[in-house]
Amino acid sequence: MTGLLAGRTALVTGGTAGIGRGIAEVLALHGARVAVTGVTEERCAQAREDGLDVYQLDVRDKKACIRVVNDVAAECGGLSVLVANAGVYPQVRLADLDDDQIDFIFDVNVKGMMHVVQAATPALRESGRGRIVVTSSITGNITGYPGWSHYGATKAAQMGFIRSAAMELAGDRITINAVMPGNIMTPGLKALGDDYLAEMAKAVPLGMLGEAKDIGEAVAYLASDGARYVTGQSIVVDGGQILPEGPEALAEM
């Protein structure tokens, strides 16, 4: 434990598994009291067994977001950090996308994010040093991947929201920023198999895939007093994946 976030209470949506779980664990290691949300009772139950403060939440439900944020603030001694991490990323080719799929991903990734930010703002304002960190993606405004046009659109929307929200929240000394993960080793990614993962790693200049804790460390910085003068920005955590020259240039050096 470093004490970087000592005295802080953080809420991580979608924090029962994957990147969100990694973020929650890192924030706790830095001294924060951490509450997480999950959409399914199964994941919530597992996280409770692991000793986390867990709240079941579907971020599409605005009233539920308000209720959960108020519960966290009341039961955990306030709220000073919100990590809007909950999201979905189904792969669907553009030609196969239908309106229901588009509505679903925007309802979760965009409206859901906005719901939790709106719900948390009063408690963050009261804390006197509120921090909001959104888990976005390099597909938001830097690069793209086949099958994720709808996902990339939601992440671009998040970044537009962050920049404008930063202007509105600044008067309350609340900062809002994003982390943009590259290829991060999650259970879903591991399921693709070792050979596929090895090929993915070759596309990263550092020669390896990231881990959820790498995202967590970036979030911890943005949630800390060290980032008090940073707002409306994003940190890319991708091992150099988006660098224009790519690994081929490194091989020639």
Which residues fall in each region the model found?
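Alpha-helical segment proximal to the catalytic Tyr-Lys
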Residues: 122, 167-168, 228
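Short C-terminal tail/terminal secondary-structure segment
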Residues: 231-253
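Short, small/polar-rich loop/turn modules that mediate ligand/substrate recognition or access, typified
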Residues: 83, 129, 170, 175, ...
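C-terminal helical subdomain
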Residues: 171, 178, 199-230, 237-239
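Conserved glycine-rich cofactor-binding loop
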Residues: 9, 16-18
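Active-site helix of classical SDR
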Residues: 117, 154, 162
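Substrate-binding pocket helix/loop in short-chain dehydrogenase/reductase
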Residues: 93-94, 101-106, 200
